[in-house]
Amino acid sequence: MVKGVETKTIVGLEVGTSKVVVVVGEVFPDGVVNVLGVGSCPSKGIDRGSITDLDAVVGSIQRAIEAAESMADCQIMSVTLAITGEHIQSLNESGFVPIAESEVTQEEIDSALHTASSIKLPEGLSLLHVIPQEYAVDRQMNIKNPLGLQGVRLKAQVHLIACHQDWQNNLKKAVERCGLQVDKVVFSGFAATHSVLTEDEKDLGVCLIDFGAGTMNVMVYTNGALRFSKVIPYAGNIVTNDIAHACTISRAEAERIKVNYASAFYPARLHGDKKIEVASIGGRAPRSLTKSDLSLITSARYTELLGVVKDELDKLKAELEAKHIKFELIAGVVITGGGAQIEDLKECASNVFHCQVRIASPLNITGLTDYVNRPQYSTVVGLLQYNYSNSDDDLISGSDDSEGTFFESIWQGVKKIVNKVRSEF
């Protein structure tokens, strides 16, 4: 008997460049995800977050949804949707409000966050996330929770993530054409942080690389707060193209060879002399090459891709240190996503970043763990954890009228001070 999804059950949907993935699960009070169903199918009609064929995307989503419904024995009505692409932009902002009653209230915290998020975004962009970093009360800095503290002025520091409205609308349209409602839209990289990073790693300083087929999502935490997020529009598909061009083979054959035999280190550390038979195009006779020969092609590109991330980290370090902010990634680099499964990637990354590296799969999962205990499921599992533990919807809901939000926050603070003065006379 098919049953409807209960309210406590959450469905995550990721429409990636290479695959569409759906996970049905419930999140326990301790944050553990109980996986009830999984659906996955090759993705068509989308490239690096941009829809190129709406009908093809709809068909891919429907197949993945049907597979998840069959496994979970339920009917999916709504989803939490992941979004990525080079249109994603982020920045750090701050907002100030006066403290009316000398003691910080929750309303004043919310007002400070609203003020910080009320900047005028470039035309076409829509705010996705308002993520608090820390607060300051007068000269007391680096406060994680200012509630109840005494002072005159409250400052909120936040990390903002925005996306292009048209890209988001097109992706939502594809989902809605499948008869589904979109509950929330979440940046893929931010979702992945919920499933693979520990609080200790965030406190010590860590860089997460969500390595996909079309994009790499880069997230940097220091002192427990998200400081940097960026989408790099190059990833695993470039390696596939390199193999196809070097060996004069189809992209499908190149992808098969990459997944089964590629190494990110030269020479390949395991079975380097293994012969690989390559199916040529145009009726030509098959050829063969060794695994080490292949690694000469692939290792150079993986080193280059990770080097792009290293350059971003170097720029971030310089910017923060110019502001006298200490930048240390004591917990190193964590790599997840489908591209993280390439052999020897950990060793390659260690050479590039000169720090400890961890290849990560989703943490805190139970139920059908055999299906999702792999790096390519980190984002979609993270969607469930984000949906359960986060709600910045209230902060975002008023962000379209940024001017109104700003002056409303100031006016509310002024009214409180005036009322306090009146009460004393």
UniProtKB/Swiss-Prot annotation:
The entry's keywords: Cell cycle, Cell division, Cell inner membrane, Cell membrane, Membrane
Pfam families: FtsA, SHS2_FTSA
Alphabetical list of Gene3D superfamilies matching this protein: 3.30.1490.110, 3.30.420.40
Keyword Acetylation: no
Membrane protein topology class: Peripheral membrane protein
Subcellular location: Cell inner membrane
GO biological process: one example: cell division
Lineage top rank: taxon: Bacteria
GO cellular component: cell division site; cytoplasmic side of plasma membrane
Family annotation (InterPro entries): ATPase_NBD (IPR043129), Cell_div_FtsA (IPR020823), FtsA/MreB (IPR050696), SHS2_FtsA (IPR003494)
Signal peptide (residue range): none
Chief site of localization: membrane
Database matches in HAMAP family: FtsA
Role, per record: Cell division protein that is involved in the assembly of the Z ring. May serve as a membrane anchor for the Z ring.
Quaternary structure (record): Self-interacts. Interacts with FtsZ.
Family note: Belongs to the FtsA/MreB family.
Protein name per UniProt: Cell division protein FtsA
